[in-house]
Amino acid sequence: MQSKEDFIEMRVPASAEYVSLIRLTLSGVFSRAGATYDDIEDAKIAVSEAVTNAVKHAYKEKNNVGIINIYFEILEDKIKIVISDKGDSFDYETTKSKIGPYDKDENIDFLREGGLGLFLIESLMDEVTVYKESGVTISMTKYIKKEQVRNNGERVEIS
């Protein structure tokens, strides 16, 4: 039986090659916690965006040499994911103010470039916090809706 709180930590080079490894690990963590398919897919997109931002921006002044830390904290009703780097920081509020709001009727060819990753992360996750001290740390939380099946008309939680 799974304990009420598990903690998994990864340290990977700041390279796009490792995004798929992180996504695969996330899928396993979320599946083990009983998350729905939609929650897993949302979290995979959000984490991919955060890691890709770290790969593209954090270490560009350091010849793209650096480490990205990823933490998964599995709690009773949610999974908290923290992604951090020690690279160059950015002004979150300034970046956020430039990305939206978007008009649903706006032609996609004319959307502003950049910042969509932050927009996606905030749209897909339940809680998002960005810290900028020595590098950038993005903390995101997804509340888990347990996968359920029907058994003779009754909903049964899969555990």
UniProtKB/Swiss-Prot annotation:
Reaction(s) catalysed by this chain's protein:
L-seryl-[protein] + ATP = O-phospho-L-seryl-[protein] + ADP + H(+); L-threonyl-[protein] + ATP = O-phospho-L-threonyl-[protein] + ADP + H(+)
User: Which keywords does this Swiss-Prot/TrEMBL entry list?
Assistant: ATP-binding, Kinase, Nucleotide-binding, Serine/threonine-protein kinase, Transferase
Q: Which GO terms describe its molecular function?
A: ATP binding; protein serine kinase activity; protein serine/threonine kinase activity; sigma factor antagonist activity
Alphabetical list of CDD domains matching this protein = HATPase_RsbW-like (cd16936)
What domain of life? Bacteria
Q: Where are the coiled-coil regions?
A: none
- Which EC number applies? 2.7.11.1
Q: Give the function comment from the record.
A: Negative regulator of sigma-B activity. Phosphorylates and inactivates its specific antagonist protein, RsbV. Upon phosphorylation of RsbV, RsbW is released and binds to sigma-B, thereby blocking its ability to form an RNA polymerase holoenzyme (E-sigma-B).
| Similarity field | Belongs to the anti-sigma-factor family.
Official protein name in the record? Serine-protein kinase RsbW
Query: To which species is this protein native?
Result: Staphylococcus aureus (strain bovine RF122 / ET3-1)
